[in-house]
Each structure stands twice: as structure tokens, then as C-alpha cells.
């Protein structure tokens, strides 16, 4: 799940979020003077962003202490300039301007974020964050079969074993090794990060860093909407969770997987349990209807990493959207280098100059990376579409929008109709059993992710708001993972352990509810684009959301381009309404997409007598803390 220029998001988020330009009709001298002021300041801001992202990219693609220090120096220097700009705006009357665009720019440029800290505190914060990132990027673990070989990295070595091993002891070994190496040593850095972000938030007039993050959604009710949305989706997740637990018990036996309770994360094929589709062979509803092995077909046809990106580029061009510029191909890092450490977590980068956009990821040729490539190219297309906006508006009006754009393209790309069109499968229309299999496969990532995405920031909100004592930081994390998602660590964890930093986004200070929101918005976007493309009609069995492919639709492309080009210049509800006809985050489209599978799960679980739900985990001390139910 790549984020936009994730590594330097802490600095950028304080200035970067709301975007757009609606100049109004006023021509008063004060308005003209303000417009000139913001025109000049946006150019300076653009140059600072270029410098920041360049230093961040250099560090991410060559993780050395020298590059880390160089990046921090750039951040610190520009933080002082950002602080001066914010103070200048606050001392003016721009926030009360008669011109709506001036007010919007003034409001967002006066949000300082971490730059509000004094120079020493700012450097300490950046050191804490970058130290966590460095540890994550360089952590290695010992092999289960050869304990003297301690050179295994998360990608590809550990993930390959989590995906393919069916030995519970081996899976638990790699889970514990990774968390012990990438998480526990970072507790002091995380505590420093919490202390300093709390201080920065108070200097910005917020009670906590959680409230600072929430305000970027420009809706005082948005947190409540997230809670309500999660509750709407929980019945579907409970059916899926119960079915998977039942099938795991069939495979591993009752000693490894009891009939009820939480599922050990190590059995789910992903380090964090945020996606379970690597274990599809254990869960497939109709195994006599085998899935097409897209990876095998890619290998047969000689696919390369370059080919994956070319296909993504062609998809956007087929919509009449922008082609990738030559600099993308020359300057991106698309595979893992052999001669240096890199942060392999996929991310897309906007350098705020001359359409310079890049991707950094350790790509391999398989169906997972086929999806990730399109996701990251969605970020890239967003950058290209709004690059004409002033720097303050070069971003998404809702943090969830940026993450949703790549995913909405991937929904078309991974459809049977599209896979047939590009020659990876022979049949572009699935029979009912194959359709259930396909929806099930998608649910193992799209639906399974929701409790994880929800818990990551519910946990950090509790930490930031001091609702969770520092003596309970680790057990509180696992209590939330259990309570919201019914998963648990494979081994007992105490406060001597510290597992949250074993996830990249926590190390990198990336607000995470954007991914939860994106998983809802992408289906709203998908439905709107499928209508534009003539690929969807309600109650039409031949034009369903789950087999819609907008490839080649100029009408869909125009609609998407108009939506993206506004950047953050206007409130997200306004641009969402123009794009989809809706004004709120609404899971109805997601539930419609998966409705056939939901009905199948309810019937199958009832037939099999599958128990649903779970109780508290027993893998943490029993006196940890109270429940967190929303």
C-alpha cells in the first residue's frame, strides 16, 4: 500500500493537504496584493518541496547515515522558512479575506505541523523518525533452517516463507524474528516521537496529534463517520473471518487453530495479517474451479518489470490521460539494487518540477506486483493531473482520495474482462462458481484490510491522546488488533516487546486511516467511472461492478482527469459530488460489489455450522487495559 512520497510525509503533511484555485470576481487592491503574495510564496514553497523530496528520495534509494543527515538538514532549514511564512500569514488579514481562495491558501499555509517546534526539538523529532525508518530498511533475521544465516530481509525472503510455508513453527519463527528486530529496539525512538508530536500539536492549537491528523479531513464529524462505516462492514468481515478460521482448522488441526477465538497472524500469509490472499489455496470456495495462474502466464509470455509498468502506462493513456514522462523511466528505482540498502516499501514521488515523478519499489513479476504497479501509477497520474496547481494545492482534498485512485484503476485491471483483453486469460466472463472464487480472492485483501487499517490509527490515536498509558503500549496494540479484527500474535507478547514499529507506516509517521477511507472511496469512484464507461447498470447481470473494465473509455478518462486536476483547491465533498454525485464516504458501492460473496458466505457458514466472532486474546497479559469498542 504505497503512500504519496511517504518518507517525507511528516514535513509535507503540515503544508500539503488542501489544494485548488477559485479566484472569485473581486479585484480590490487588497485581493490583488494577496494574490501576488501567494503567487510568490507558492513558488518558493514549490522549490522547498523539490529540495525536500529530492533529499528524501536520495535517502530512500540509498540508506546511509550521510544521506539521512543530509535529508534532516534540508528538513530543518525549510522548517524555519515555513515557520516564518506561517507567522507572516497569521499577522496579516489573509485568513479573513473576502476571496475564498485566499482564505483557503492562508488557512493551509498557516498550519505548521512539526515546524512549530524549536530547532532542537525539530531535529530530535526528525532523528527519531528517520532512525525508525533506517532500522526498518536494514533489519535482517536469521533463517529457520540455518540459524547461522542472519541475512534474510523482509522482501523478498521473509515474505516468501510466510506465503509458501505451511509449517506453523517456521511461520511463528519468522514472525517473531521480524518483530523482535524491527519493532522492539525502536521503543525509545517511538516514545520520543510521541512526546515531540504531542508538543508540536499543542503549539498548533490541537489537543493531540490525533486531532492534528483528523483536521486534514476538513470535517469535524469524519472520525465518527469512520467508526460508523467500520460497524457497517463488520458483519461481512465476521462471516469471512469465521470461514477462514474454519478452513485453517481443517488444514492445521485443533491444536494449531481452535474452533473459536482469534487467528494467529503468522498463519495468514502476511507479516501484519492485512491481506490473506497468499493462502488462497487453503480457502478457495470451489477448488474444482482453479484460479488462472496469472504469474505463470506472465512468465510464459516473458513479462519483465518494465512490461508491468508499460501496461500501467498504456491503461492511463487509453483513457486519454497523461503518459509517463521520459524522466520517470530514467530516474525511478523499480527493482532492488544489489549494491546498497533501499527502503523497499513501494512509494510514488512528486518532485514539484518539470513533471519529474518517480516510483521506488522492489518490483517482481507476479500478480501482486501487477496490482501494486497500477496502484503506485495512480499516485503518479494524480501528480501529473494537478501539477498546474500552486504548490499549496498539489495534493488530494481528502487523504483517502490519493490512495483510492490507484486502487480504482486496479479494480478494472484485475477484472476477468481486462485480463482477457491483455492476453493473460482466455475467458473474460466467469461462471457463478468462478465468480465467487474471484470475489473471495479480492475480499481476502479488500475486506480483510479494513479492521487492520482501522486498528493502526485507533491505536495511535489512543497513544497520542494519552488514553493508553506508556506501560500498556504493546499490549494495548494487540488488544485492539484482537478486538477489531480477531487476530493475535503467534506467541505471548509483553511490554518487554514493542511490535507497532514492525510496520513501515508507523516508523515513517504516515497517517493510516487514509487507507481505510481509500478502501471505501475506491468503490464509489469505480461505480461512477463504470457508469461513464457504459460498463455498469444496476440489476444487469452482464454489466456488474465486479467485471467492469474502463480501459479505453475516453468518457471515464475525462471525468477522472477533471476530478484529479482540482487537487486540493476545494473541499473534498464538493469535488466528490461533481465526480460521483455523492457527498459522503459510503460503503454501499463496496457492499454491492461483494454482495454475491456475502450471501454465499452466510449460506455456507450456516450449512457448515461455522461459529462466528471471537473473544479476547490470551497472548497478552490479562490485566492489560479496557476494551476499545467504538
UniProtKB/Swiss-Prot annotation:
Where does the record place the catalytic residues?
376 (proton acceptor), 505 (proton donor)
Q: Where is the signal peptide?
A: 1-22
Q: What is its main location?
A: secreted
Q: How does activity depend on pH?
A: Optimum pH is 8.6.
Activity regulation: the record says: Inhibited by captopril, lisinopril, trandolaprilat, fosinoprilat and enalaprilat.
EC numbers listed for it are 3.4.15.1
Entry note: cofactor: Binds 1 zinc ion per subunit.
Q: Which EC main class describes this enzyme? A: hydrolase
Q: List the disulfide bonds.
A: 142-150, 344-362, 530-548
Q: Listed GO cellular component terms?
A: extracellular region; extracellular space; plasma membrane
Matching Gene3D superfamilies: 1.10.1370.30
Binding of Zn(2+) occurs at 375, 379, 403
Question: Which residue ranges does the record assign to the Peptidase M2 domain?
Answer: 28-615
User: Mind telling me how this protein is modified after translation?
Assistant: Glycosylated.
Q: Give the reactions, separated by semicolons, that this protein catalyses.
A: Release of a C-terminal dipeptide, oligopeptide-|-Xaa-Yaa, when Xaa is not Pro, and Yaa is neither Asp nor Glu. Thus, conversion of angiotensin I to angiotensin II, with increase in vasoconstrictor activity, but no action on angiotensin II
Give GO MF terms, alphabetically: carboxypeptidase activity; metalloendopeptidase activity; metallopeptidase activity; peptidyl-dipeptidase activity; zinc ion binding
InterPro entries, alphabetically? Peptidase_M2
Keyword list, A-Z = Carboxypeptidase, Disulfide bond, Glycoprotein, Hydrolase, Metal-binding, Metalloprotease, Protease, Secreted, Signal, Zinc
What is the deletion mutant like? Defective heart morphogenesis leading to lethality.
Q: Known PANTHER family for this protein? A: ANGIOTENSIN-CONVERTING ENZYME, ANGIOTENSIN-CONVERTING ENZYME-RELATED
What family is this protein classified in?
Belongs to the peptidase M2 family.
Something else known: In contrast to ance, does not hydrolyze angiotensin I.
Q: What does this protein do?
A: May be involved in the specific maturation or degradation of a number of bioactive peptides. May have a role in the specification of heart progenitors.
Instruction: List the protein's name.
Output: Angiotensin-converting enzyme-related protein
Organism per entry: Drosophila melanogaster (Fruit fly)
State the gene name recorded for this protein. Answer: Acer
Amino acid at each position: 500500500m504505497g503512500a504519496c512520497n511517504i518518507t517525507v510525509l511528516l514535513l509535507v503533511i503540515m503544508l500539503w493537504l488542501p489544494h485548488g484555485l477559485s479566484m472569485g470576481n473581486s479585484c480590490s487592491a487588497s485581493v490583488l496584493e494577496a494574490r501576488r503574495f501567494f503567487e510568490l510564496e507558492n513558488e518558493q514553497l514549490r522549490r522547498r518541496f523539490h529540495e525536500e523530496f529530492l533529499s528524501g528520495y536520495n535517502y530512500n534509494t540509498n540508506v546511509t547515515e550521510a544521506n539521512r543527515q543530509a535529508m534532516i538538514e534540508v528538513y530543518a532549514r525549510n522548517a524555519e522558512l515555513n515557520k516564518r511564512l506561517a507567522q507572516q500569514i497569521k499577522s496579516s488579514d489573509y485568513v479573513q479575506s473576502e476571496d475564498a481562495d485566499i482564505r483557503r491558501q492562508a488557512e493551509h499555509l498557516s498550519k505548521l505541523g512539526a515546524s512549530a517546534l524549536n530547532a532542537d526539538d525539530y531535529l530530535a523529532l526528525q532523528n527519531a523518525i528517520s532512525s525508525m525508518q533506517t532500522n526498518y530498511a536494514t533489519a535482517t533475521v536469521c533463517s529457520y533452517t540455518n540459524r547461522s544465516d542472519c541475512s534474510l530481509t523482509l522482501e523478498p525472503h521473509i515474505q516468501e516463507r510466510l506465503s509458501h510455508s505451511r509449517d506453523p513453527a517456521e511461520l511463528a519463527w519468522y514472525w517473531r524474528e521480524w518483530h523482535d528486530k524491527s519493532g522492539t529496539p525502536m521503543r525509545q525512538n517511538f516514545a520520543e516521537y510521541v512526546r515531540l508530536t504531542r508538543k508540536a500539536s499543542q503549539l498548533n492549537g490541537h489537543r493531540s496529534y490525533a486531532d492534528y491528523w483528523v483536521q486534514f479531513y476538513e470535517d469535524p464529524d469524519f472520525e465518527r463517520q469512520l467508526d460508523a462505516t467500520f460497524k457497517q462492514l463488520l458483519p461481512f468481515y465476521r462471516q469471512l473471518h469465521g470461514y477462514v478460521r474454519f478452513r485453517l482448522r481443517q488444514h492445521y488441526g485443533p491444536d494449531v487453530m481452535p474452533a473459536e477465538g482469534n487467528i494467529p497472524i503468522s498463519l495468514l500469509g502476511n507479516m501484519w495479517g492485512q491481506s490473506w490472499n497468499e493462502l488462497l489455496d487453503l480457502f478457495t470456495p470451489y477448488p474444482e474451479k482453479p484460479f488462472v495462474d496469472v504469474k505463470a502466464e506472465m512468465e510464459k509470455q516473458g513479462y519483465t518489470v518494465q512490461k508491468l509498468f508499460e501496461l500501467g502506462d498504456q491503461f492511463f493513456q487509453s483513457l486519454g490521460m497523461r503518459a509517463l514522462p521520459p524522466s520517470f523511466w530514467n530516474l525511478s528505482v523499480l527493482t532492488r539494487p544489489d549494491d546498497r540498502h533501499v527502503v523497499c516499501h513501494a512509494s510514488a514521488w512528486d518532485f514539484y518540477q518539470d513533471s519529474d515523478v518517480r516510483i521506488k519499489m522492489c518490483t517482481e513479476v507476479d500478480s501482486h506486483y501487477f496490482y501494486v504497479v497500477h496502484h503506485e501509477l495512480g499516485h503518479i497520474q494524480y501528480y501529473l493531473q494537478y501539477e498546474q496547481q500552486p504548490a499549496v494545492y498539489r495534493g488530494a482534498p481528502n487523504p483517502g482520495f490519493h490512495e483510492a485512485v490507484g486502487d480504482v484503476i486496479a479494480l478494472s485491471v484485475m477484472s476477468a474482462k481486462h485480463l482477457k483483453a491483455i492476453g493473460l486469460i482466455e475467458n473474460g466472463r466467469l461462471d457463478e462458481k468462478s465468480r465467487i472464487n474471484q470475489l473471495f480472492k479480492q475480499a481476502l485483501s479488500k475486506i480483510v484490510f479494513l479492521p487492520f487499517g482501522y486498528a493502526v490509527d485507533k491505536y495511535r490515536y489512543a497513544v497520542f491522546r494519552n488514553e493508553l498509558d506508556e506501560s500498556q503500549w504493546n499490549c494495548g496494540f494487540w488488544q485492539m488488533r484482537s478486538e477489531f479484527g480477531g487476530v493475535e500474535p503467534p506467541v505471548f507478547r509483553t511490554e518487554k516487546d514493542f511490535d507497532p514499529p514492525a510496520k513501515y507506516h508507523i516508523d515513517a509517521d504516515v497517517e493510516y486511516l487514509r487507507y481505510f477511507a481509500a478502501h471505501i472511496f475506491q468503490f464509489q469512484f469505480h461505480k461512477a467511472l463504470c457508469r461513464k464507461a457504459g460498463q455498469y447498470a444496476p440489476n444487469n447481470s452482464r454489466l456488474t461492478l465486479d467485471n467492469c473494465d474502463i480501459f479505453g473509455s475516453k468518457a471515464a478518462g475525462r471525468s477522472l482527469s477533471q476530478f484529479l486536476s482540482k487537487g486540493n483547491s476545494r473541499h473534498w465533498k464538493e469535488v466528490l459530488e461533481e465526480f460521483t454525485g455523492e457527498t459522503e464516504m459510503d460503503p454501499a458501492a463496496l457492499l454491492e460489489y461483494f454482495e454475491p460473496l456475502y450471501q454465499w458466505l452466510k449460506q455456507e457458514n450456516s450449512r457448515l455450522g461455522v461459529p462466528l466472532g471471537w473473544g479476547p486474546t490470551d497472548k497478552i497479559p490479562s490485566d492489560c487495559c479496557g476494551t476499545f469498542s467504538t
